[in-house]
Amino acid sequence: MIYLDNHATTRLDPRVLEAMLPWLTDHYGNAGSATHEMGREARAAVDAARESFAAAIGATAREIVFTSGATESANLALLGTAARVAATEPAAARHHVVTCATEHHAVLDPVAHLERQGFAVTRLGVCPQRGAGVPGRIRLDDLRAALRPETCLVSVLLANNEIGVLQDVTAIAEIVHAHGAVLHVDCAQALGRMPMDVDALGADLASFSAHKFHGPKGVGALYVRRRGRAVRVEPLVFGGGQERGMRSGTLDVPGIVGLAEAARLAVAGLADEVPRMRALRDRLWEALARGIPGLALNGPALDGHDAAGRPLRLVNNLNVQVSGVDGQTLLATLARDEPAVSSGSACSSESPRPSHVLLALGLDEDQARASLRFGLSRFTTAEEVDTAAARIAAGVARLRA
């Protein structure tokens, strides 16, 4: 199987599995059981993993809360912050949330829930595919205009899971903090694909999923700033009081060990993997463009950089528009003979509606439906890229005939 859907999930690295196996078999103690050796060794493994993961993202160990993944982390960040505000602020005093129209549904849906609970919500648009600005980026002037004295929280996606655009989070953080609001950053797609330092980004809260960087599914983390501008969130789950009371439930020791090892490997391999994945991504684009007349790129230019020299797009991301072809029909054709690709977020891939991200870029519904998303990984090879491009071009030719 040629797998090019690495924004949906990634292959578990064998080295991560090796690190996890002892905690699935011989060392299966509960990290909350301090009365015997098996419990204490499980707790020691969790503590070591917390230190390791914190180092990988530029945090301290006490700023890490282990969760089931970025969706839970985002919900805890957003709903937990809102609950804190509701408990400590007069009604409507700080009950305004700002986010972006191109966020993942792990953010959009809890924000919609807050709106139903009485919070005011502003959803920022982004620069269009054709027009001024970087396609998919938030206009900073729009953010400034959206902020109010009652704004308590802003949530942005560092790296978009569909079009790969990288938001200028450091600039966003300066604006948000000047207004006294809390900034949540969805970092699910970023770790292992770009340098990661949550403190330098200016994030107050940041969410992560292990399975996005070759770790196990079902485990993630929430970064909660405790240095300088320390923030507090209310828990959403109650019971055993684990994770300093912020996330009750028996800790997934094997998963947490796997998360930390996957993050360590992602950071250790960054210098080699970033240029390698960029070269493969560009190779894929060039091969597709040669084989498919009229192919168009969705999102920022592949070689685009901002004024500070920072890339505008994830190195492993490609999103293309195939005119005259329905994306779902093409995917069904490809499913018979590979490669594995998608038309958008895995969390909404069964929806008949076109991608909300592409619609926010200004594409019409037909253009959005005619788009394909590719995500490369450390396991993607040049041979796979070449074969995938040839098969996709052949599939498009059959559908256009």
Which ranges hold each PLM region?
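Pyridoxal 5′-phosphate
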Residues: M1-A401
